Design a protein with these regions (language model features):
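Active-site histidine-anchored catalytic micro-motif
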Residues: 140-205, 237, 242-246, 252-258, ...
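Short glycine-rich phosphate-binding loop at a beta-alpha junction
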Residues: 96-108, 345-357
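Conserved phosphate-binding/catalytic loops in two-lobed NTP-binding clefts
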Residues: 120-132, 348-349, 359, 365-389
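Conserved phosphate-binding catalytic cores of ATP/NTP-utilizing and phosphoryl-transfer enzymes
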Residues: 35-47, 125-148
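Short glycine-aspartate micro-motif
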Residues: 47-49, 103, 146-150, 245, ...
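Internal gly/pro-rich beta-alpha loop/helix module
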Residues: 1-42, 244-245
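Acidic, glycine/GT-rich loop-and beta-edge segments that sit at the periphery of enzyme/chaperone cores
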Residues: 161, 212-220, 394-417
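A contiguous, well-structured pocket-lining segment that forms one wall/lid of small-molecule binding clefts
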Residues: 52-90, 205-347, 360-367
Length: 417
């Protein structure tokens, strides 16, 4: 055998594509797709967009096109960060374009944000969920107005809190937060991304307060050690390392833990995936659980999931299998989307963010919106998750920059509350 470990000059993973609602949907855009351009409605100045921290891609905008790089991955390691820099430089050389500004996420601690600020160019910070919305709008070749349903695990909100269950009214130049999921605390912060039981405890605290630790029939409580009970009670009571979040992704994790489907994930998205698999065993979609939609003054409407989880827990206590409660949970989230679309009254509804990698949720939402007379749009050529952020960042800045030079785009596409 003649072998040689040749260095990889330009890495490119295999692309991942599936069929959703009869159409192709790209989940990982790499070999065979990148760096093919996405056409955009407004010409962009020479611009580099550096994406987010997870599932990173970068993009180079030139005129009426945005060239999206191959999937780079999570920027947790020095090797990944060097790959991001190489991908950005490769695009500039390939297209013979010298970027004159950089777009990045609003999160101050992302490696991609630090990379953007280190380029020595004017920087435009684009709010995470606004970038999701603009990406979905652009790849579907649409113009505002639209309602964007932006559901994912986490994104830095302009108010400094952790967003993730957002409804944005997308207009010609900006986005407005017109609805959100009710927030709840996440004991342990980022640890809750791996341990759905933490999300479940935070959710139960929001529903029951200190009484949650008396609910030994519930798996997330029953399986706590004595020291864990003390520590979690102190964290939640005093708000220590327990940031509040509106994340739809963490609702999936909490539901999976409460239904005893998955309490601790071995890989990203495991809890939500197992919950979807359990729901598919239920057969035809059952009816949704109750929920409330509350609006106070001029603030964004709030979808209150507490009636949903009260009903889910009651049904789970009497059920032989998690299948029906899991299916009804999915149906409820789809019903929430339709309810908010009806409140806002915008015909076009964009379904974007990592939660819409869940095919059951996506197809239920599409069907429900169509029955209610709306026109749903979702990602097909660009991933619905953070792999599409760079496209959205480029589009947001292109819409606000209007081809002007200088650093006046420093606050591009902040979301208005």
């Amino acid at each position: 055998l003649l072998v040689h470990d040749r260095p990889i000059r330009r890495h490119a993973d295999d692309s991942i594509v599936r069929i959703v609602a009869g159409r192709e949907q790209v989940l990982r855009r790499a070999r065979g797709y990148a760096p093919l351009p996405i056409a955009i409605r407004r010409a962009a100045p020479p611009l580099l967009a550096v994406g987010g921290h997870l599932k990173n891609t970068v993009a180079l905008a030139r005129g009426g096109e945005v060239f999206l790089s191959q999937h780079i991955g999570d920027l947790e390691t020095p090797e990944a960060r060097r790959a991001q820099e190489a991908a950005a430089d490769d695009l500039a050389r390939l297209l013979a374009v010298e970027p004159r500004r950089v777009a990045c996420d609003l999160h101050p601690d992302y490696a991609s944000t630090r990379f953007a600020h280190g380029r020595g160019l004017p920087v435009a910070e684009v709010q995470h969920h606004a970038a999701h919305a603009w990406a979905c709008l652009a790849e579907n070749d649409l113009e505002p107005p639209a309602l964007a349903v932006c559901w994912d695990g986490a994104g830095w909100g302009p108010d400094g809190t952790v967003w993730g269950g957002e409804f944005l009214a997308v207009d010609a130049e900006d986005c407005r937060r017109m609805g959100t999921l009710r927030t709840f605390p996440l004991p342990g912060g980022e640890a809750a991304m791996r341990e759905g039981r933490r999300a479940a405890l935070g959710l139960l605290w929001e529903m029951l307060g200190p009484r949650l630790f008396d609910q030994s029939a519930l798996a997330p409580v029953r399986n706590l050690t004595a020291s864990e009970r003390i520590n979690f009670a102190a964290m939640l009571r005093r708000g220590l390392n327990s940031p509040r979040t509106s994340s739809a992704g963490r609702l999936f994790d909490a539901a999976a833990a409460l239904l005893e489907v998955c309490s601790v994930s071995r890989f990203e998205g495991q809890a939500a995936m197992e919950l979807e698999f359990a729901a598919r065993r239920a057969g035809p979609p059952p009816p949704a659980y109750p929920f409330r939609c509350v609006r106070s003054g001029g603030a964004a409407a709030e979808l209150d999931w507490r009636p949903t989880f009260a009903a889910l827990l009651a049904e789970h206590a009497a059920a032989q299998s998690p299948a029906i409660p899991a299916a009804r949970f999915h149906a409820t989230l789809a019903a929430m989307i339709v309810a908010m679309a009806q409140r806002e009254g915008r015909e076009r509804v964009l379904l974007t963010g990592g939660c819409f990698q869940n095919r059951l949720l996506l197809e239920l939402a599409i069907a429900g919106l169509r029955r209610a007379g709306f026109r749903p749009y979702w990602h097909q050529r660009v991933p619905p998750g953070d792999g599409g952020l760079a496209l959205g960042q480029a589009v947001a800045v292109a819409r606000q920059a209007n081809g002007e030079e200088g650093d006046g785009c420093a606050s591009a596409s902040r979301v208005k509350s």
